Amino acid sequence: MVQPQLTRDSMIGPYPLPPVDDALRAQARAQPGQWLDFLDPMIDPATPNPPAFAVQGGYRADELGQIVEYSINPRYEPSELRAGFRCSSAFELTLWRALHGFNTVGMLADAFASATLLAYVDHPGAEDLPAVPDPDQPGTSLLLVCSSWTFCSWENAVEVTGSFLLGLTSNTDAVLIINPGTGLSLRLAARTMMSLARTPHQQHQ
């Protein structure tokens, strides 16, 4: 489960770049004053001037060939080879980035609020979204949503916006489960998601 006290700048995914090892230090000594970039696996590492979206990040070597800085690309767009699927929406891409250490949880919350999602309903034509009891935490209600049909395992779902879900759960202790049971799953209290999301007005400040 995601740890509670989160801020907009919190990272919930692992550090995405390879660790600095002897081979990387040797490469830095051989390329002083340059960035050592790590590209998407679909891109040939020897490609000159690769597109920015294909760069995962990198380390910078100073003039003495010492690694002194790193950079993680928050706009990295993983290929299907890297992600294991093709992202079908801006939210799905941001969710993948957040879970893999490229985007902050604040960026995720903003994307969730503006996303169109699939929410679980218990029968065709239902309009009310059922709160599912958490089998592991009695007394906790779960709200099940998916980022797309790619990750949806139930037949009955309705399209809703993330902002609608946040408004619906603002005064509850409901927990959001995004893409339950998949490799792109996240569990987060709805109240936490709402507190981290900026309104469109705030996003321009």
Residue map of PLM features:
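An interfacial alpha-helical scaffold signature
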Residues: 2-205
